[in-house]
């Protein structure tokens, strides 16, 4: 379900990502990507285990 604020939220996130893409170093980008992937993977594992129990 798409709410009224979601396109604005996506636009703000996209603008922030583009801004950070030019301002932060490559090592920091890799660290951020690794942290986000780790959080998503842990959430997926907990969600899978919870739904299997």
Swiss-Prot record:
An annotated GO cellular component: virion membrane
Membrane topology: Multi-pass membrane protein
One function term, GO molecular function aspect: helicase activity
Compartments, record wording: Virion membrane
InterPro entries per the UniProt record, alphabetical: Poxvirus_A14.5
Family, per entry: Belongs to the orthopoxvirus OPG141 protein family.
Superkingdom of origin: Viruses
TM stretches of this protein: 5-25, 30-50
Name of the protein in question: Virion membrane protein OPG141
Gene (name only): OPG141
Entry function: Protein probably involved in counteracting host defense, since it enhances virulence in vivo.
One annotated GO biological process: DNA-templated transcription termination
Record PTM: Not phosphorylated.
